[in-house]
Amino acid sequence: MFELRKLPYDTNAFGDFLSAETFSYHHGKHHNTYVTNLNNLIKYTEFASKDLVSIIKSSSGGVFNNAAQVYNHDFYFDCIKPITGCGCGGSCQSMDANLQAALEKEFGSLENFKAEFIKGATGVFGSGWFWLVYNTKNQKLEFVGTSNAATPITEDKVPLLVVDVWEHAYYVDHRNARPAYLEKFYAHINWEFVAKAYEWALKEGMGSVSFYANELHPVK
């Protein structure tokens, strides 16, 4: 059985990006519901003893939707962090040199990467996610937009960064202003986490996805 992961930060520390109320609903209710639903759906089935990634890759329907949403939310919550009290609005965050070089090689510049990321995430129709992934087939970084519960790990693409563009992720604080939410999201990206995900993607490929998920949800 799976458990709701704990968040690695104070949910009151995000200023006008995300309120504690948003975390209370997003993590405490939405995310928790996916965990609860998944446990109820897999009880007494062949999925009961499987790890999260294996369930995602071998299921469909309700089991897939809830398992994928557990993973998607786990990853999203690790992709953000509070800004330190330096007054820079997140602009002084240092980026790992290898990650920066890879982004500049693929997207031309960090400025262009940001512009394309926000444009792509703004353009996701309806509910979904916008990802930066490492494609294990061509060894390139690329953007992927997914709808509803869909996740790029089913296509052997390793997530490095994701933003949740379901309205429940931002409506309390930003109403229908998705672009404003995305600007704030970008300022709160946990680049250390993204760099580590990239490092392990290069070393282990899709194995890094299972390692990440199993650390949060060890098979019992």
UniProtKB/Swiss-Prot annotation:
Keywords: Iron, Metal-binding, Oxidoreductase
The protein's Enzyme Commission number: 1.15.1.1
Entry keyword Heme: no
Reaction(s) catalysed by this chain's protein: 2 superoxide + 2 H(+) = H2O2 + O2
GO MF entries: metal ion binding; superoxide dismutase activity
First-tier enzyme category under EC: oxidoreductase
InterPro entries on file: Mn/Fe_SOD (IPR001189), Mn/Fe_SOD_BS (IPR019833), Mn/Fe_SOD_C (IPR019832), Mn/Fe_SOD_N (IPR019831), Mn/Fe_SOD_N_sf (IPR036324), SOD_C_sf (IPR036314)
Annotated Fe cation binding sites: H26, H73, D164, H168
Any Pfam family the entry gives: Sod_Fe_C
Co-factor binding details: Binds 1 Fe cation per subunit.
UniProt-listed PROSITE patterns: SOD_MN (PS00088)
Cofactor(s) recorded in Swiss-Prot or TrEMBL: Fe cation
Function: Destroys superoxide anion radicals which are normally produced within the cells and which are toxic to biological systems.
Protein family according to the UniProt entry: Belongs to the iron/manganese superoxide dismutase family.
Quaternary structure note: Homodimer.
Name of the protein in its database record: Superoxide dismutase [Fe]
Organism: Campylobacter coli
Gene name as annotated: sodB
